[in-house]
Amino acid sequence: MAVERTLSIVKPDATRRNLTGKINARFEEAGLRIVAQKRIRLTREQAEQFYIVHAERPFYGELVSFMISGPVVVQVLEGENAVARNREIMGATNPANAAPGTIRKDFAESIEANSVHGSDSLENAATEIAYFFSGTEIVG
């Protein structure tokens, strides 16, 4: 098994409800280490650029507005098969379809306010991590 890094974002719905610690505990209990973390407020430009792959989708504007509606916690998670493991811990994008015990099933308010973002591939993880963190900010 390969040790990987992936990006996680604790979204505004979760930070507003002070769930960051509970979410972090889920990652750590599953064997992922948080090797970088910061609480920030995204600008509209940052959110638009980060989610540019969805620019043509009908939900893009609402997604950007939601992501700038409050603070987020951006994180780098490290561990065995971190990308797939994080996606398993998060659960399905739509919390109604998420398995019991996943972050989205337990904490999400809706498909939009679904508490967390996670990279969907190693390639995207590398791009997303570099978007928020310099190499010196990641402490393994």
From Swiss-Prot:
Domain of life per record: Bacteria
EC annotation from Swiss-Prot or TrEMBL: 2.7.4.6
An example Gene Ontology molecular-function term: nucleoside diphosphate kinase activity
Binding, ATP: 11, 59, 87, 93, 104, 114
Cellular localization per UniProt: Cytoplasm
Catalytic class of the enzyme: transferase
Keyword check for Transcription regulation: no
Active-site residue numbers: 117 (pros-phosphohistidine intermediate)
Pfam families membership: NDK
Alphabetically ordered keywords of this record: ATP-binding, Cytoplasm, Kinase, Magnesium, Metal-binding, Nucleotide metabolism, Nucleotide-binding, Phosphoprotein, Transferase
Catalysed reaction equations from the record: a 2'-deoxyribonucleoside 5'-diphosphate + ATP = a 2'-deoxyribonucleoside 5'-triphosphate + ADP; a ribonucleoside 5'-diphosphate + ATP = a ribonucleoside 5'-triphosphate + ADP
Gene Ontology terms describing biological process: CTP biosynthetic process; GTP biosynthetic process; UTP biosynthetic process
SUPFAM superfamilies, per database record: Nucleoside diphosphate kinase, NDK (SSF54919)
TM ranges: none
Cofactor(s) recorded in Swiss-Prot or TrEMBL: Mg(2+)
Disulphide bridges, residue numbers: none
Recorded family membership: Belongs to the NDK family.
SUBUNIT field: Homotetramer.
Function comment: Major role in the synthesis of nucleoside triphosphates other than ATP. The ATP gamma phosphate is transferred to the NDP beta phosphate via a ping-pong mechanism, using a phosphorylated active-site intermediate.
Protein name: Nucleoside diphosphate kinase
Species of the source: Rhodospirillum centenum (strain ATCC 51521 / SW)
Gene that specifies this protein: ndk
